[in-house]
Amino acid sequence: MANLEESFPRGGTRKLHKSEKSSQQVVEQDNLFDVSTEEGPIKRKKSQKGPAKTKKLKIEKRKSIKSIKEKFEILSLESLCEGMRILGCVKEVSELELVVSLPNGLQGFVQVTEVCDAYTQKLNEQVAQEEPLEDLLRLPELFSPGMLVRCVVSSLDVTESGKKSVKLSVNPKRVNKVLSADALRPGMLLTGTVSSLEDHGYLVDIGVGGTRAFLSLKKAQEYIRQKNKGAKFKVGQYLTCVVEEVKSNGGVVSLSVEHSEVSSAFATEEQSWNLNNLLPGLLVKAQVQKVTQFGLQLNFLTFFKGLVDFMHLEPKKMGSYSSNQTVKACILCVHPRTRVVRLSLRPIFLHPGRPLTRISYQQLGAVLDDVPVQGFFKNAGAIFRLKDGVLAYARVSHLSDSKKAFNAEAFKPGSTHKCRIIDYSQMDELALLSLRKSIIAAPFLRYHDIKIGTVVKGTVLAIKPFGILVKVGEQIKGLVPSMHLADIMMKNPEKKYSPGDEVKCRVLLCDPEAKKLIMTLKKTLVTSKLSLITCYEGAKPGLQTHGVIIRVKDYGCIVKFYNDVQGLVPKHELSTQHIPDPETVFYTGQVVKVAVLSCEPSKERMLLSFRLLSDSRPKDPGVESSQKKTGAVRIGQLVDVKVLEKTKTGLEVAILPHNTPAFLPTPHLSDHAANGPLLHHWLQTGDTLHRVLCLSQSERHILLCRKPALVSTVEGGQDPKSLSEIQPGMLLIGFVKCIKEYGVFVQFPSGLSGLSPKTIMSDKFVTTPSEHFVEGQTVVAKVTNVDESKQRMLLSLRLSDCSLGDSASTSFLLLCQCLEELQGIRSLMSNQDSVLIQTLADMTPGMVLDAVVHEVLEDGSVVFSSDPVPDLVLRASRYHRAGQEVEPGQKKKVVVLHVDMLKLEVHVSLHQDLVNRKTRKLRKSSRHQGIVQHLEESFAVASLVETGHLVAFSLISHLNDTFHFDSEKLRVGQGVCLTLKTTEPGVTGLILAVEGPASKRTRMPVQRDSETVDDKGEEKEEEEEEEEKEEENLTVKSKKRHSLAIGDKVTGTIKAVKATHVVVTLADGFVGCIHASRILDDVPVGTSPTTTLKAGKKVTARVIGGRDVKTSKFLPISHPRFVLTILELSVRPSELKGSYSALNTHSESPVEKIRQYQAGQTVTCFFKKYNVMKKWLEVDIGPDIRGRIPLLLTSLSFKVLKHPDKKFQVGQAIEATVVDPDVPRAFLCLSLIGPYRLEEGEVAMGRVMKVVPNRGLTVSFPFGKIGKVSMFHLSDSYSEAPLEDFCPQKIVRCYILSTAHRVLALSLRSSRTNRETKNRIEDPEINSIEDVKEGQLLRGYVKCVLPSSVIIGLGPSVLGLAKYSHVSECVPPEKELYNGCLPEGKLVTAKVLRVNPMKNLIELSLLPSDTGRPDVFSPAPEPKQEERSGGAEEGQKRKEKNQKRREEKEEPQKSQRGGRGKRERQESESEQELVNKRPKKSGAAEEDDSGVEVYYREGEDEVGEPKLPPRGKQTKSTEVPRLHLSSGFLWDVGLDSLTPALPLREESSDSEDEQPHQAKKKKGKKERELEKQKAEKELSRIEEALMDPGRQPESADDFDRLVLSSPNSSILWLQYMAFHLQATEIEKARAVAERALKTISFREEQEKLNVWVALLNLENMYGSQESLTKVFERAVQYNEPLKVFLHLADIYTKSEKYKEAGELYNRMLKRFRQEKAVWIKYGAFVLGRSQAGASHRVLQRALECLPAKEHVDVIVKFAQLEFQLGDVERAKAIFENTLSTYPKRTDVWSVYIDMTIKHGSQTAVRDIFERVIHLSLAPKRMKFFFKRYLDYEKQHGTEKDVQAVKAKALEYVEAKSSALED
């Protein structure tokens, strides 16, 4: 190329059209490569000095413009503009963006939000829910490298470095924005994304406004099977589609993604393309107009011209193009401003839908010498040829380091240069080179080139708060975290570093995929000469290296190395000397030298030491022995310990019986912070502590805990062992580990810990966390967030979040626990030899002592002494002097308030009402006024105003309730309201109580005048008596005092017999209850013990306990005398004979009784009910012990599991096995199927959690275990689709194969789960290579296809290999053919050729000669008669599918031929005749004409070069058209399913001319008469049909006629709307609704409302939220608002839009709060969503808002809803309370009876009837109830029951008659 200008020939050209001229001028202005154009302004500036140069400049300019017209410039960043549509190829895929390769070596980026609107909406939903959505695919799952995508340039940004960045979008709404609905034509090739999944296909977003595009399942099957690995399309999936059919002027479009249709789609003139809507990626047939050295100029689609630059010519045909040559081309881009169309002739773009195969180049980054120039293009660049033949391209900007150094003469063809491969352009199939010396010399070109541990040089780019950004290469940036800026932590790094500084770093971590580079500037690490640890495998014991401390813990330091490898330095390895607190010695970020002690690469666990070990280091035998002993103790174990020594911080103890040393810190001695130091003080060496919890252990250290709350948690199994077991919302009990300024760290017994930030630490404002909590404090925490990836969780300690139930109950439990511990301390004190200590141990509050005044102090307090014990100090505060004047030596009577066991002092009082307290009997649960006398940290001592008794009550209502403002704190002398929990002082000397509301506290001390006290006491008694009278109406009428004790025998009469208990009336009017478990000693299984007792029978029973009337809770009795209302009785023969001592176990609490049960124990329980919501059986083991039987533990029968309540009767005795005793909640988890834990060989019921395609099932069990079922264990006979019968939540019967791992191995084979079955095992289990024998025929599933073989799974862990030569006799040449025929999961039959156990290799054969099966590439032959029995159903399904496929194929063909008359019928008949003749002619040869040859014909069809049939008579063009496939190619389809490809409309005229023998014949007179008569008959038939009133409308005209005749009928209008909706004509349906609203008369309010509701439904289903809101607002204006609100709420609920429904109900409750219908509907809505607690609050709110007259109706409605949707027991309670207040509301009784009949037992129904017929009602109403009772017994009872009702009715009539006579 001696003269570069020769490349641009000059000369005359044809005249251009105006449009072409304007186009050329714009190109001319956009020319950014022309050097002369850039120099134009400079020349003009010079020309001002000399006018002689002006003429010369103009001549040069004209020549330049003329030459530019012939130039073919390549794309550059400067030539791109926003809105430009361009074809690209996916280069890289990350989680948040795509990197897309563009033509001419450019690239752009697609953000995750630019895929499509539906995908963006899903992403927003996922962000809002804060958890991943199952149906949302990640970006790498939607796109893969090599995919061709149509893009639009969304923006051209400038990066921080000043370079342009191209932002792209593949959103169809932006790419196809230029298309309109009316521009759509069949055959168009478009791209779109899946927007939703429908029943029969997918809705595809093609971005055309007003168009709904639908892709049927039939058209998607081939794509799903071959390219989607059998998985259904998901939202956001990118598709290249062909428009098959256009309806409603583009409103509805049918699409196809079949490969044959997509690959053959060309843009045609009939599709009406123009320059405005021409899209990249379209294939066109073009004609070469002009050939130049730089490319071609083409004509296509008649009117359009385009350019092909030198990069996109077909390499093999380079130089062979000529004018007028016809070529296939692909449109690359259309410039929106210049209208220049760029095309490509490369073969890779001529097959739409096919991804690019080569997406990278292996030699990226390589430096090459002597690379020859192939060609040079001015202003574009140079083409080089590499040694492997690959072409490479270097832009002009990469040919030299600067413009000045560039010399075009140096790049003549044949010249060689040194260069470096910097990238590979997929779109151009070219390697991209650079000749810049700076790039060639750069050590790193990509992140892949950087090795971990390498020392690199870089330049500081910026200083950020989190670290320093360093530039390492041209496109490589790294981060130096703040911790790694220096060997020490730097506070002001900007003082040492500034942008532009050169630094030397060492690489810590490099992730090329994420483009993440982390480096360090720590001098010790950068200059270290020691070996580096970059992986766990390289960490050998004894290796010494440098690392960085990243965390300092109590148990040691965590040291981090390179590549995120880290290890632990235990506390004992930190130094040769003991370091009690590592945080005071070490700090985060410290560089240390360590030695590796041990490493487990599989567990990624490494132990290190700061004590740089040598082989000669002596070992401590004591340490080894202690380590052996610690191994015997496990975390969570309860042990007994003996105190060895007391330290300042705790107790050194020995764990019995091995005397293993351990440590028990002082805060862990008690849940109460004040009791810990007391226990520490009084525990002595040699004392033994029981039930101590092992909290944590290391090699030298075991930490113990004695906190009762933590011990109970571990015992109850409520302590999660790993973070994966923890879910947000869980309540956990732990202790405060440490307190920081930003929050509190809480640790749990298993060792897990979490952070409670200040914001959620307390309901009060937190300034300093240490004011609210102390280290070691027991707390209850609620999990708010779990991050498993970072092994972190956030906790809330707020009381509002961590409620444990009733605050009064919790407060009382904490008080009992605290006083119990104080009593234990008294026992420790009593063991001392000191008389003073023993005296203090014997003193209890309330004792009255004679004391002598010893001293009166300045503050007014008095110190007393006692004669018997001289050292005893008694102290009375100024308040407790009670205003008395005292002098030393004076004798006084004092009362003990509290004994300080630490200071050895006694707090006393001189108040006379305390010293002389009244002996007045107190009642339990009675409320009293009290005065605070003494305050301790966790409880207070008060005196009752009426009597002077001392009472203790807790100051905290929760473990977290430890902080109170000064205004909230109690003071001595303050008045409080107390509710008594005990009535007699126990061993503590105090009566126990709980405090009432804080609002009832009084500031000043109440009066203590005796008269006032007496008056108030009398008033209090009167108030309590009145309250008791009110409670009698709601409870039992026999609430009387009695003097019975446990063990007493009583005699009574049975009042009523229930299913699970019997009610007994005792002689004195008391009521007792006999539970079903207290009737017989041995209860036969299946019987109901209560049936042995009859109403009216007298029984003798033993008192065993009592039951609270209000709460119905069992009350254990801990002392012999008690006063209760309902007594618990027993009539067991053994207990009636026994003595009182034999019954002392009944005094235990339910929690203690639960502890006595062990897993595996067999118990007898009594069925109570089946909880439908919770899916478990509720049973009673005893009166105070409940049980639950999960549904899956009920039976191994699927029939029973479907209706478990039908198997058992209420009260029936059942024998069950204890699975797990739930101690805190006092119930047992039971099982009816035998095993109480999952063991190998057991059969259990499970529930499918997840179905994994081509893998198997994940199954969950009620034992908390998870198991997996392999594909090979689903059945004894494999099938083609083994997983289609399984779905999540399905119940399956499983056999436990193995429990060796955390995830169980399961089997669903009938031979395993049901040993009694005798079904033949068609596919035996293959568990190892030993189970396989040579010559054996086996079936298996295809796992994958390799380049030379196929891998087949024979068992869960057994694979076989079939070489291509043993797969098929056809031997197709490409791997893709195997992928298509043998997809993953396909069932195949194989013969075992060889078994090599040494190599663990099984060779298989799929050849028909070995297996007897058809070839995998041939259609399946008709099975023999004996083979049909096993697959009859599958064969029938296949036939139905084929028949359906043929019918669907014939439908459009019939529609195309519909109007062609007799000629078409004759053609179809002749064609059918020919098709029918062929099998007769060929006979048996038809079976041979299958498989390979049909397969190769299909392949030839794809290429587009049809060939003659291989054998048989060749058909002429006038004969039957060639057969084609109806829906993709199916290997199992025979020739009978192939249909002829009938000619289209365009071909019909040609075929008609070519077939003269099929022309129309002239009709005779007789034939014309017959046709006329036939037409008249048809016309009369149509008229009769139109007059038929029962005729169904079939068209819009039919509906128009109907609505004209009945304009006010909303039914017709709704049918009209439905007619349009079925045709997806949404706008027409809206128009019909609007017509209806205008047409229907205003008097027909209901008819109009029906249309409004239909319109709301339409907008909810097909419209937007905005359109729905507009319709709703209009409907409210024209109708009764309440009705419209209720209808919309129903619409939201039915469409499962619960959030919108809830918001609407809240609006209704504000606007219509006086309407009971709104409250009832809202209650039904809440209960329907299983929110029982919310429904209770709704009822309370309703009663507050509605008038009193509506209350009963609303309460009854809510009770009905509870029966239907909620808890039956709660519904009964509501009815009972209502009827106790309104006993004569017969309507309520009637509803109660109806509900009980539907949802209750027969016993319950009869009980209600018995109660109602004994009411004193009017005779008319009594007659109604007697009639209902009689009808019920006739239907459900026996003849005896019917007679009994009649007798009762007769008794009632006689009683009434006698009353009238009197």
Swiss-Prot record:
The modification Phosphoserine is found at S7, S438, S1468, S1490. Residues 43-56 have a biased composition (Basic residues). InterPro entries: HAT, NA-bd_OB-fold, Rrp5, Rrp5_S1_rpt_hs11_sc8, Rrp5_S1_rpt_hs1_sc1, S1_domain, Suf, TPR-like_helical_dom_sf. Residues 83-171, 187-258, 281-346, 365-436, 453-522, 542-611, 636-707, 729-798, 846-911, 1047-1120, 1160-1233, 1241-1309, 1335-1407 form the S1 motif domain. GO terms for molecular function: NF-kappaB binding; nucleic acid binding. There is a cross-link at K1424 (Glycyl lysine isopeptide (Lys-Gly) (interchain with G-Cter in SUMO2)). This is Protein RRP5 homolog. It comes from Mus musculus. The gene is Pdcd11.
